[in-house]
Amino acid sequence: MLRKAVPKGVPVAADPPTSELALRPLGFEHLAAVLDLGHRVYDTDAMPYTGWSLTAVAGHLDAPNSACLVTLDGDRVAGFVLGSLSFEQRADWGYLEWIAVDPDYQGRKVASRLVQECCARLAEAGAVCVVTDVERRNTASAELMRRNGFTERATVSLFVRPLAEPAPADGATARDTAASRRHFTRAAERIR
């Protein structure tokens, strides 16, 4: 679910950006900003699988046929998309895995440009279609996908069963479940 406001302590631009935005391939130099933006924009407490680890994002840099891009305003990451060729057992399907746009840049077609370029790169790599998943309450992302040619094909529910953990016998503290949630990743690591 997208957050409505920027958390306290996160710097925001005083005025809306006015410069020309550049679309570039995701590079190592963008990793920290991509993770920061993704975690600022998505509420990972509501939907834990919307969060990514550094390892998961960095893994895309070495992947063949990667369709991972950033939109830059100078050196500032205004938005990003992570896409890959293969979805579950379908090597001919592309997967638009994660997209986020800084609130300062929303309304400037940054997300649509990222979606279109990601899909074009996946098509060039041999994808016959591109799939993505959108949380039911994330109406802004659902509308973005519809505007860019996606149609709803299936509904999937995330079922969660909390498990009680016994207290450790050696006096050690129980594992940090919040840390576990932060490192819970999406389908790419979940299935492979």
Predicted regions and their residues:
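Conserved GNAT acetyl-CoA-binding A-motif
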Residues: L122-V134
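Conserved beta-strand-loop-alpha-helix junction that forms the acyl-donor binding cleft
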Residues: Q106, T132-A142, V160
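Conserved acetyl-CoA-binding loop-helix of GNAT-fold acetyltransferases
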Residues: V101, G107-A120, E143, R147
